[in-house]
Amino acid sequence: MDDASTLIDVKEYPGTEVQKNRVLTLEEWREKWVDGKIGFHQEQGHQLLKKHLDTFLKGENVLRVFFPLCGKAVEMKWFADRGHCVVGVEISELGIREFFIEQNLSYSEEPIMEIPGAKVFKSSSGNISLYCCNLFDLPRVNIGKFDRIWDRGALVAVNPGDRKCYTDIMLSLTRKGFRYLLAVLSYDPTKHPGPPFYVPDAEIKNLFGSTCNIHCLEKVDVFEERHKSWGIDYIVEKLYLLTEK
């Protein structure tokens, strides 16, 4: 694993299993949206993505970009406005509808025949498609392959016991020459049960190391007042670029 030079020294807990059996149900995630408990949403978009956008896109045009557990991420419109094709998956129909409304985008919706009860929401422009379903059901649908994956708030939200299955799905969606940008969080997992869950460097290497080159682009202190209620006194965000070996 190639590591970025940084002044931030992050304590790692590679052997901890304190969050190993932690499980959040899909209904609990839906309830977070209904109750407005979406502190993970960033209205101004992700600053590290903005900073490293050129590294991510590599000057290429008309890319297919995948957003796992997309919520109402404003970055989806950024990419669509630049001519890229955006596909996302999100369990909360409310989150998807709020995205289209807040971005002032007209859209249509239709059932996903392969997944009972699931829907796909498509922008009228045709370059944003958001699937409202369980991410782990997504392999039943042929959504094609992707040039780029922007994984922020996804791996850290997946129940720890499901990470291997999640990673297998993500890598199955990649095209040759893909670039996968991954944001994870480091904090003391003995003090906060998650989500967002703690993902140590060793776990990233274990999940992606056999198929991907792993490069840490940056580490930033993202501690805010609201994090005090989690019982932690530091939280660091790490941005990784994963590329094909």
From Swiss-Prot:
Pfam families: TPMT (PF05724). The keyword Transferase applies. Coiled coil: none annotated. Its main location: cytoplasm. The modification N6-acetyllysine is found at residue 58. Its EC number is 2.1.1.67. SUPFAM superfamilies: S-adenosyl-L-methionine-dependent methyltransferases. Substrate binds at residue 40. Keywords: Acetylation, Cytoplasm, Methyltransferase, S-adenosyl-L-methionine, Transferase. S-adenosyl-L-methionine binds at residues 29-40, 69, 90, 152. It is found in: Cytoplasm. It is an enzyme of class 2 (transferase). PANTHER family: THIOPURINE S-METHYLTRANSFERASE (PTHR10259:SF11). Monomer. This is Thiopurine S-methyltransferase. It comes from Panthera pardus (Leopard). The gene is TPMT.
